[in-house]
Amino acid sequence: MNIKQKIDNLRQEIDNWNYRYYVIYQPIVSDFEFDKKLKELEKLEAQYPEYYDYYSPTQRIGNDINNNFAQINHIYPMLSLSNTYSWEGINDFYNRIKKILNENFVIACELKYDGVSISLIYESGLLLRAVTRGDGTTGDDVTTNIRTVKSIPLKLYGNNYPRFFEIRGEIVFPWAAFNKINKERIENSEPPFANPRNAAAGTLKTLNPQVVSQRNLDAYLYQLLGDNLSSDSHYENLQLAQGWGFKVSNIIKCCKTIDEIENFINYWGKWKKSLPFAVDGVVLKVDSIRQQSLLGRIAKSPRWAIAYKFQSETVKTTLHSVDFQVGRTGIITPIANLEPVLLSGTIVKRASLHNEDIINALDLHIGDQCYVEKGGEIIPKITGINKEARLTFGNKAVNFPKNCPACNTPLIRFQNETAYYCPNYTQCKPQIKGMITHFASRKAMNINVGEETIETFYRAGLVRDIADLYEIKIDDILQLKRWAEKSAINFVESVQQSKQVPYERVLYGLGIHFVGEVVAKRLAKAFPTIEQLSIANNEQLTTIDGIGNQIAQSVIQYFSNENNLQLIRRLKLYGLQLFTIQKIFIDNKLAGKTFIISGIFRKYSRDKYKELIENNGGKNVSSLSAKTDFILSGVNMGPVKLIKAQRFGIKIISEDEFLKMIE
């Protein structure tokens, strides 16, 4: 046997041991024997670098090189699931599927893992890329970190898998590993992770793959996607994937009746804490891929699936005090400080009280015994008070402040709103820092700066508003402690690059109350320049789809403030995009034609197809009518659109047909 064959045999043997240990829990060698073989392979690979293989089991460990996460577009959108906490919701889902399909169907019931969603792309049996959910359209490329998760195969078994496919699942932090790392963090005077989901998410975004490798994350796969799947059955596809080396839970049941579904949910609702990982419900999916395609999707979720969320656990503890926090928009949020208590596997010390109305409804007093639960097993909240246990003296009632806890400005409360606001946004420190953080965020200006750095700049007097970011010089930063020249240069370059961010994102970054991403896009389209928007009246604003009186008044109020107008003049002076760049038609091949885009696409994103339509003289519309010329259809086109298209005689075209039209 030559050296190459010996190395190949060792790799194959260790891959097999990894699979048996991490995926099917059937180890066949001791840890000592495994480590011995791994070291032998490492030694041979070091001696014969010409036989280096990126997919070798020795390459899972990672290295100390930091990497920035690239943004990757999903081939298929990573939709979120509709959810319910009631049997009524399950029955509604089941009956809706029954009515739409009007044929026999099977529901696959699976556990809902409480971790981080991941999309894995394989080509020719090799792991090509791993991407987080992100915003559902675009996610972070975390391939380097995912390679260290030992239950995810770098190279598949057998040869009966599709040449190119995607498989999705959940990265979880098993309870044993989670408890171990929290114990170590406490011993090292580090704050413990709040729960396994947060720990998994934080670990996956760590820039050091070696740290990820040491934390023993696990992965369960639950959906196969691709053009050439072996079976029409979701369940059968998962069983095939298990044979390729993927970890697929055996806790999955194909149900033909509503009673079977309820039995599955009841069983795991009772025994969920016996599992080695956190779960927060059960996912129901129509098993047939064909039927899934017929059912299609709504804006954010598939019609063919729903998540049943387990009811929250409730515990009793003591209220010690209440803090009132100031958010970036000036909203005052009361936070209860509690006697630490174990709730759903985590230590709870704080809970949101949301607003004054809730405090008054609870009749909250310091020292009260409170009933606390986690909404959806995530956010702690006080749901009640044990008034019988309240002392007859010494319990001080919790009263909402009349003045801002940060700047002492009298608070205001708008009509029909439950929140109180601090109106002093130009001088209130938490608002200033929050506004700058929002402005610099990825979805706005995408400036490479975090909350801690903004705090440092604020304390040094470098920033008091968003425009000040554009005045900071490298020399200013180098005067601060622990700042290297390279970091200072990177920050300043990031600020300069933000000047190319389009108008709609600048508008979103201004932080106008009630103006989120979608509203900012609509305003930018209706008013191509900031000057036009600044003089718009209520009537002009409310004629825009999706903009009501509340948003309109907020926009008008913002631009009626001289401080804001002065801020915008400064931003304009610094060269920010405060106008819409008019699109120039590349061609007029689609002139006079209207299109609706529906479904999931393989070659380009929906936004890219919309751009191609407009660049070739066509028009995108949002609703079907007899005047619509074409439906550009991908996978999972909605059944309602299909019915309407047939009624109106609208031509349905594929991606390839569309691309031929604009060649």
Swiss-Prot record:
The gene is ligA. One of its GO terms (biological process) is DNA repair. NAD(+) binds at residues 31-35, 80-81, 110, 133, 170, 285, 309. Zn(2+) binds at residues 404, 407, 422, 428. It catalyses: NAD(+) + (deoxyribonucleotide)n-3'-hydroxyl + 5'-phospho-(deoxyribonucleotide)m = (deoxyribonucleotide)n+m + AMP + beta-nicotinamide D-nucleotide. One of its GO terms (cellular component) is cytosol. Its cofactor is Mg(2+); Mn(2+). Keywords: DNA damage, DNA repair, DNA replication, Ligase, Magnesium, Manganese, Metal-binding, NAD, Zinc. Belongs to the NAD-dependent DNA ligase family. LigA subfamily. Residues 585-663 form the BRCT domain. Gene3D superfamilies: 5' to 3' exonuclease, C-terminal subdomain, 6.20.10.30, BRCT domain, DNA ligase/mRNA capping enzyme, Helix hairpin bin, Nucleic acid-binding proteins. It comes from the Bacteria. Its EC number is 6.5.1.2. NCBIfam families: dnlj, PRK07956.1. GO terms for molecular function: DNA ligase (NAD+) activity; metal ion binding. The keyword RNA-binding does not apply. This is DNA ligase. The active site is at residue 112. It is an enzyme of class 6 (ligase). DNA ligase that catalyzes the formation of phosphodiester linkages between 5'-phosphoryl and 3'-hydroxyl groups in double-stranded DNA using NAD as a coenzyme and as the energy source for the reaction. It is essential for DNA replication and repair of damaged DNA.
